[in-house]
Curated annotation (Swiss-Prot):
Belongs to the eIF-6 family. One of its GO terms (molecular function) is translation initiation factor activity. HAMAP family: eIF_6. This is Translation initiation factor 6. It holds the Pfam family eIF-6. InterPro entries: eIF6. GO terms for biological process: cytosolic ribosome assembly.
Length: 224
């Protein structure tokens, strides 16, 4: 299933909301209509909490079904909320705090910013229980903003090379294709909310973009 909406006029949904196959994390002030759409499309429990005192869960977190990684600026009461819901969450040690911009992961692997420390990569590997590979894509290190990935497929920045697409496929273990969202926006990871059950994109997303998203994430086979 694919849904389209903007949050208060903002189509860059992947910055605001984090979604995996077992949970979606949203702002506590998110309107009921959005919550209903998220629940229907992604078919996961929803946790309402600020992250680092903000409404930017997607930018400040990354992870997969095994665990979540979070900015070191997280508040203790926010961690308590996540752990009360039995979420395995670990704090990242580095100064690169926009975790969602520098890590993209599914249940098969993780691609990360080459600037991450060895300690950070160890935490990622142990928390997510996957192989961790450093890379840039299309000349950029913000891999979490450049790739939207689930356990079905990965949509990648349109300037990615064939070699980079092959790497995404090898590490994440899913088919990868280039594409855009929101009428030509290349930072697909920052704009898409997705898990294996569905995808949510901004209202500006065009018909051809939706067709590519449907194909890449293999949504025609239905929910898991």
């Amino acid at each position: 299933m694919i849904q389209k909406f903007d949050i208060d006029g903002n189509p860059n949904l992947g910055v605001s909301i984090l979604a995996k196959d077992n949970v979606a994390i949203v702002s506590p002030g998110l309107q009921d209509s959005y919550l209903k759409s998220i629940k229907e499309t992604l078919n996961v429990p929803i946790i309402k909490t600020p992250i680092c005192g903000s409404n930017l869960a997607g930018a400040l977190m990354a992870g997969n079904s095994n665990g979540l990684l979070i900015s070191p600026y997280v508040f203790s009461h926010e961690l308590d909320v996540l752990r009360e819901h039995d979420i395995n969450v670990e704090i990242m040690p580095d100064k690169l705090t926009a975790i969602g911009n520098i890590i993209v992961a599914n249940d098969n692997g993780a691609l990360v910013n080459p600037s991450l420390s060895d300690e950070a990569k160890r935490i990622i590997k142990n928390t997510l229980e996957v192989e961790v590979v450093e890379t840039s894509i299309a000349g950029l290190d913000i891999v979490g903003s450049l790739v939207a990935a689930t356990n079905r497929g990965a949509l990648v920045h349109p300037d990615a090379s064939e070699e980079e697409l092959d790497l995404v496929e090898d590490v994440l273990g899913v088919p990868a294709e280039i594409g855009t969202v929101n009428r030509g926006v290349k930072l697909v990871g920052a704009c898409i909310i997705a898990n294996s059950n569905g995808v949510i994109v901004g209202n500006k997303t065009t018909g051809p973009e939706l067709a590519r998203i449907d194909q890449v994430f293999n949504l025609f086979e239905g929910s898991l």
